[in-house]
Amino acid sequence: MSSGGLLLLLGFLTLWAELTPVSGQDPPRFCSLPAETGECRGRIPRFYYNSASKQCEQFFYSGCGGNANNFETKDQCHYTCVEKPGVCPPRPQQQGQEGKNCENDWKCPGQQKCCRYRGKTECKDAVFEKFASTTRTPTSIGSTPVGSSVPT
């Protein structure tokens, strides 16, 4: 890798470290930055998170400069900046079913969400169907407060 490439990588890593929230409960702050094409003459298709439309959208990157809201694929953008769908399941009654510890949805694999149960957080499979009645459930980190009612 050339020294210019290493400097660019170092710059992006420094920017990422500065813009990542300390709490880990929200998407990285760079997700709210506008699309920035950069200073070179290239025309590389990339994706950025548009905080106004709340979607990952395509733009053309020049190949140098720009900011960290710049992803090679729409999936990378979505995984980094969009909250995962679904809600956390009710707290498991049985012991031994604990999932991986997490800080936010983005630290959980696949469609799992980061759920808080009595002060501990763990990755759990998201629930997508409507509840038959109003139920008190734990919540995904960064969305509705724990213990809030989930309406039908």
From Swiss-Prot:
Tissues of expression: Expressed by the venom gland.
Residues the record lists as Pyrrolidone carboxylic acid modifications: Q25
Annotated site location: Reactive bond for trypsin: R41, G42
PROSITE patterns per UniProt: BPTI_KUNITZ_1 (PS00280), BPTI_KUNITZ_2 (PS50279), WAP (PS51390)
CDD domains assigned to the protein according to its UniProt record, in alphabetical order: Kunitz_PPTI-like
Domain WAP as annotated: residue spans: 81-127
Signal sequence segment: 1-24
GO annotation, cellular component aspect: extracellular space
GO molecular function: serine-type endopeptidase inhibitor activity
Chief place of localization: secreted
The entry's keywords: Disulfide bond, Protease inhibitor, Pyrrolidone carboxylic acid, Secreted, Serine protease inhibitor, Signal
Similarity field: Belongs to the venom Kunitz-type family.
Protein name as catalogued: Fused toxin protein
Lineage, top ranks: Eukaryota, Metazoa, Chordata, Craniata, Vertebrata
